[in-house]
Amino acid sequence: MSRISLEVCVDDPDGLEAAVAGGADRIELCSALGAGGLTPSPGLMAVAAPPPVPVYAMIRPRAGDFIYHRADLEVMRRDIDAARHAGLAGVVLGASLADGRLDARMLTKLAGHAAGMGLTLHRAFDLVPDFAEAMEIAVDLGFERILTSGGAKTAPEAVDTLERLIELSAGRISIMPGSGITSDTIEALVPRLAITEVHSSCSSAEPANDMRLVEMGFAAPERRRTDAAKIRAMRARLDAPAAKA
């Protein structure tokens, strides 16, 4: 098995530094990881470039569902423009219909607007009723990879499904497991799965440093921060001989 790439999601400048220092191969740049990841600000995109490793910006204009309308599309197009202007390598996209299927028309418009940039399909994929249908849409639109937990809350809970997705992909698109992947849980996935990349936050919990901020509603009692040591630990597990067996 060839070297497995590690993508780390971050949502602030400190996270960017930690990801690079820890040895991430690619960065998913977001804001508000506590809400599942939203579009980063143009300022954060600019700080991320020129990056020492490829950076893909999450394009998700709001928390909640992935059902987008005309006004959302205009916002997302402008966010893609900001990522391109910042010199980022790619964008992370997803859009759903009310029944959970991928919104092929919306994704066609978004992918077309991002022409020339790398494309990752995010975990809107995990909500679809038919993985095969959704994968064909992603392949037809030129996505490089699908970030997925196999439809479960965490990827280690859905190893059998992930294995089927990899077989279904037939080398046409990368299946990148994500959600709940740590240096302790990665052994559930490799070497069993023939994957070339994984996604993780590699983060540590950190309590709020001022409870007044929590009381006033400006901060959560706890937040996750990208941890360079956890990235190094994950990298070591991925590079271990057992992971390549």
UniProtKB/Swiss-Prot annotation:
- Where does it live in the cell? Cytoplasm
The entry lists its GO molecular-function terms as: copper ion binding
Q: Which Pfam families match?
A: CutC
GO cellular component terms listed in the entry, alphabetical order: cytoplasm
Record keywords, A-Z: Cytoplasm
| Domain of life (superkingdom) | Bacteria
SUPFAM superfamilies in alphabetical order: CutC-like
Family matches, as InterPro entries: CutC-like, CutC-like_dom_sf
Q: Which family does it belong to?
A: Belongs to the CutC family.
Q: What is this protein called?
A: PF03932 family protein CutC
